[in-house]
Amino acid sequence: MKKNNGGRGSKTDAPAVTRVRTPRRENNEILATVSALLGGKRVTLQCMDGIVRMGRIPGSKKKRMWVREGDIVIITPWDFQDSKAEVIWKYTRPQVEWLERKGFLK
C-alpha cells in the first residue's frame, strides 16, 4: 500500500521532461552555473560567455527557487552594469541532463 504523503507527488518519481525552457537571445538571457552563495539573495555566477557575475535572486522567486552551488540557472545581465545579473530560472536535474544531451551546456 502506498504511503500517504499529503497530496504531493513522491520525490523519488522523476517527472518526464516534456519541454525545457531555453535561454532567449532576444531577451538577453544566458546560462550560468552557481559557483558560490554569498548570503541574502546574492550568488556568484560563472556564465557561459566566460564572465563571472554577481547574481541577485529577486524577492518574488527567493522562497520558491532554492538555489545551491552547482545549479544551472538562466540569468539576464543588467543593462547598466554588465558585472551583475538577475537569476530568472533554475533547472531541475532531468532538465540539466536534457540540456547536456542537446549541446546547450559545454
From Swiss-Prot:
User: Which stretches does the entry tag as region Disordered?
Assistant: 1-25
The alphabetical list of record keywords is:
Initiation factor, Protein biosynthesis
What GO annotations for molecular function exist for this entry? RNA binding; translation initiation factor activity
The segment(s) forming the S1-like domain are 18-92
Stored Gene3D superfamilies: Nucleic acid-binding proteins
One Pfam family it belongs to? eIF-1a
InterPro entries attached to this UniProt entry: NA-bd_OB-fold, RNA-binding_domain_S1_IF1, TIF_eIF-1A, TIF_eIF-1A_CS
Domain of life the protein comes from: Archaea
User: What does the record give as the function of this protein?
Assistant: Seems to be required for maximal rate of protein biosynthesis. Enhances ribosome dissociation into subunits and stabilizes the binding of the initiator Met-tRNA(I) to 40 S ribosomal subunits.
HAMAP family associated with the record? aIF_1A (MF_00216)
- Its family? Belongs to the eIF-1A family.
Q: What is this protein called?
A: Translation initiation factor 1A
Q: Which organism is it from?
A: Methanococcoides burtonii (strain DSM 6242 / NBRC 107633 / OCM 468 / ACE-M)
* Top-level taxonomy: Archaea, Methanobacteriati, Methanobacteriota, Stenosarchaea group, Methanomicrobia
